């Protein structure tokens, strides 16, 4: 009788895992990425210029922090990933991390944007290093389980595509709002005191970050069967990952994504402030890209339906992103505004399609790995995806800081031609070429819809 009840429970769980995800859960999952962006996009777009132009920290110190902090990530990301796999609560494996991690991370975000320009350079660097490293850890504790949650909500490949579309559309809306309102909000809250303006915005965004993740926690549900807990040595898990070719390509895609996207984002405010002459243009630019970004994200399922391959879909979007970003080099919002904003809109239309596709790949790679090796370690795999993205981010932002510092960047001053040239190319041609390279790499992704369905059939037969 006990065996019959267990069998019925497992069958029920499997049916649920292949079923439709309720609309409110899709909405809540998307809201999770709204929260993520109100912290991490704020950090990616504004923290570097906050450190150099508001806090008064040298460009070389900022570059060093961005690189050194990745060693910290290399330690904490796999640990957090393993801990999420070992978490077993009445709420599931991943959702509890949102409940407890989001409020704490929101507080650390506020502390990170609390400037003390009157301190000594040594004190500033210590404060920067401590708050940033704790912020990175807190973000990992929330974002890693959040990203893995998609694979626990359903095993249906089309439902996962819809979940990731909801995530990406929500993210693009959040990014647009952040980019449009942040500069005016800093000015409005600060009333002439930029230091206070940044702090007030951090408080607001921290509240939004926590609220979105708490909503995500309450309205989502983990239905995929939790595997029997296995005590697997690190080398065994690493070996299983190395045999997962689709996952390795997804990891490479995330590394390149982090390098290109966050490096360019860190440059954008410098570009508009110093090359084009006005930080206000950044808000106009953001207004031009918000609607195309949302539409581009929503187009992912349509393109995927035609290709049947998420990796190839990502490659198409990446290639077109690269072409349009290279085109941006030849136009200026001051001299050729229509063409500048047209190419900006197109580049973000294609980028948001890529953004949806590259995250939609990850849950499918987990099932491929389970089918290939017999090991299912969602959290561990997502940890290295997160780490790859962060390493890319660190390399992109630190190389930008090193290049600007070496060329003679001086905060809040007229920049020399070499500095302006670096800012211009970092906004257009460099990311454009790198997006085309990314497209070439993702063309080798072979896990298509037909193969995935066969993998799921094989896995279900094994469970029976």
Residue ranges and their predicted role:
Residues 2-464:
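Membrane-embedded alpha-helical bundles of multi-pass transporters/translocases
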């Amino acid at each position: 009788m006990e065996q019959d009840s267990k069998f019925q429970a497992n069958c029920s769980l499997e049916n649920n895992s292949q079923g439709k995800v309720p609309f409110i859960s899709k909405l809540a999952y998307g809201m999770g990425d709204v929260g993520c962006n109100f912290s991490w996009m704020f950090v990616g777009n504004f923290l570097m210029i906050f450190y150099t132009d508001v806090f008064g920290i040298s460009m070389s110190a900022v570059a060093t922090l961005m690189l050194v902090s990745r060693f910290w990530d290399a330690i904490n990301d796999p640990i957090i990933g393993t801990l999420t796999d070992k978490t077993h609560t009445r709420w599931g494996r991943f959702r509890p991390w949102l409940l407890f991690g989001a409020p704490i991370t929101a507080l650390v975000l506020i502390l990170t944007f609390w400037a003390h320009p009157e301190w000594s350079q040594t004190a500033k660097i210590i404060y920067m290093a401590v708050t940033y490293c704790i912020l990175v850890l807190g973000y990992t504790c929330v974002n890693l389980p959040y990203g893995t949650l998609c694979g626990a909500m359903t095993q249906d490949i089309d439902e996962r595509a819809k979940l990731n579309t909801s995530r990406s559309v929500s993210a693009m809306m959040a990014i647009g709002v952040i980019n449009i309102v942040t500069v005016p909000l800093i000015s409005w809250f600060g009333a002439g005191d930029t230091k206070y303006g940044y702090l007030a915005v951090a408080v607001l965004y921290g509240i939004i970050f926590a609220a979105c993740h708490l909503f995500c926690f309450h309205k989502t549900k983990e239905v995929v069967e939790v595997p029997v807990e296995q005590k697997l040595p690190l080398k065994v898990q690493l070996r299983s990952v190395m045999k997962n070719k689709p996952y390795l390509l997804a990891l490479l895609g995330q590394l390149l994504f982090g390098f290109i996207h966050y490096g360019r984002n860190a440059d954008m405010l410098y570009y508009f402030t110093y090359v084009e002459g006005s930080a206000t243009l950044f808000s106009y630019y953001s207004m031009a890209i918000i609607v195309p970004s949302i539409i581009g994200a929503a187009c992912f399922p349509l393109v995927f339906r035609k290709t049947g391959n998420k990796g190839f879909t990502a490659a198409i979007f990446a290639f077109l992103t690269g072409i349009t970003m290279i085109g941006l080099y030849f136009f200026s919002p001051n001299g050729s505004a229509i063409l500048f904003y047209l190419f900006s809109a197109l580049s973000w239309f294609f980028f948001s399609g890529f953004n949806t596709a590259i995250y939609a790949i990850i849950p499918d790679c987990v099932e491929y790995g389970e089918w290939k090796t017999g090991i299912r370690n969602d959290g561990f795999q997502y940890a290295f995806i997160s780490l790859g993205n962060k390493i890319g981010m660190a390399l992109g932002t630190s190389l930008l800081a090193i290049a600007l510092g070496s060329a003679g960047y001086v905060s809040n001053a007229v920049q020399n031609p070499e500095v302006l040239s670096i800012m211009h190319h970092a906004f257009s041609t460099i990311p454009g070429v790198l997006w085309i390279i990314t497209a070439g790499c993702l063309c080798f992704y072979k896990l298509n819809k037909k193969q995935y369905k066969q993998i799921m059939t094989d896995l279900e037969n094994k469970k029976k």
